[in-house]
Amino acid sequence: MLVNRWLFSTNHKDIGTLYLLFGAWAGMVGTALSILIRAELGQPGALLGDDQIYNVIVTAHAFVMIFFMVMPMMIGGFGNWLVPLMIGAPDMAFPRMNNMSFWLLPPSFLLLLASSMVEAGAGTGWTVYPPLAGNLAHAGASVDLTIFSLHLAGVSSILGAINFITTIINMKPPAMTQYQTPLFVWSVLITAVLLLLSLPVLAAGITMLLTDRNLNTTFFDPAGGGDPILYQHLFWFFGHPEVYILILPGFGIISHVVTYYSGKKEPFGYMGMVWAMMSIGFLGFIVWAHHMFTVGLDVDTRAYFTSATMIIAIPTGVKVFSWLATLHGGNIKWSPAMLWALGFIFLFTVGGLTGIVLSNSSLDIVLHDTYYVVAHFHYVLSMGAVFAIMAGFVHWFPLFSGYTLNDTWAKAHFAIMFVGVNMTFFPQHFLGLAGMPRRYSDYPDAYTTWNTVSSMGSFISLTAVLVMIFMIWEAFASKREVLSISYSSTNLEWLHGCPPPYHTFEEPSYVKVK
């Protein structure tokens, strides 16, 4: 029965499918919001109205894309579908908790949408800094609803993290050590640890903000001995690990895709890849104040956060060059998934380079809160995380659905998206260097040219989304079933065919370790 199968599911494949569908839908909402932003900025002058409504849209765009698109698709979708298959487990460790993790997300999304429907909306930016987020500048229920939304999404992620950690550590076959699990499994494990350690700090920060707003506490109010900078420290102690949470599963996906389409049986430097991810995860927790170079930190504090941030480039470089080494000498198949993966490697590296620029505290004084920062993080998210999701999606679509995508449409989709995102975000580096600030709905007309180019690019990206929807419809309409799969010991998830049966590995799997 439909209700029993889809509402009360305890099956990792069905829950993974729910996550993917929810993430895709949220992604379209987030895309619509981004199109509104770029429409407003396409030329000087007002389109939507004042800066409050503009900032409500910007804030909602960020929250929707981060908490309801990237995280549900990468961790909930790919994680649920693939982790049990890759380690030979019958399901997740806590199947009912898995269902609850998913069903906390729609109510959370509803609360976020409600926050923009009441009063003037939450126009705080995704950082929700007080005093702007306090009850003077944002009277009414909007910010409170946003905080409750974040609480639900956070609980969902924490439960999911506990589930993945338990599954990966406890549900491997006895003969399989942790260092024999695929890189995607490692990436999800490390991501889960980051979630478990960082989200409670966010919960504390936004709960203190909630009591400041409603119960007359003064955690972030100097009038009562509080300090708004405390909120920034709490938020960014979560916020920086969060950006690694968004990209780490992508690293895992790219490792699998690059290995598969290079005709290699294993990625180059497996151990180096694992340690690099662990290093990135650890370092992600000790660099948070690089988001705060303009708030008046001591010079020695700034020196530390600058150098610590630059250190992250080393394990990241290990990963990039290992992917290139995996490609080297391989029998490369130019499939759509491989194109997404190669696009990821190139554009993620560009985003990483601008990150190195921003890690310099002296330069960041000039670039902070300009479009240079926007360009930087959209290169690593809109062309890192999203390209990784697309690579994983077109690679594993036959596994999830049993049908194959049309190769030509998939390549066309990649080409349109590649042009669109680059045309959107590359000019923003110029705007930032010229001093255009973020989070404003209008600008001096000296900035018109590049904003117009950027907005045109965003409509090309929108076209790519429409092509993708058609491409998926075409696959299900044509029903081209998978005939054969090139299966090897390093891509265990394909073992049961496409799609795999509802229950896999019902008996403990026998793994012979070479």
UniProtKB/Swiss-Prot annotation:
The gene is Mt-co1. Mg(2+) binds at residues 368-369. O2 binds at residue 244. Heme a3 binds at residue 376. It comes from Rattus norvegicus (Rat). Cu cation binds at residues 240, 290-291. It is a multi-pass membrane protein. This is Cytochrome c oxidase subunit 1. Its EC number is 7.1.1.9. The lineage of its organism: Eukaryota, Metazoa, Chordata, Craniata, Vertebrata. Residues 1-11, 87-94, 171-182, 262-269, 328-335, 401-406, 479-514 are mitochondrial matrix. Belongs to the heme-copper respiratory oxidase family.
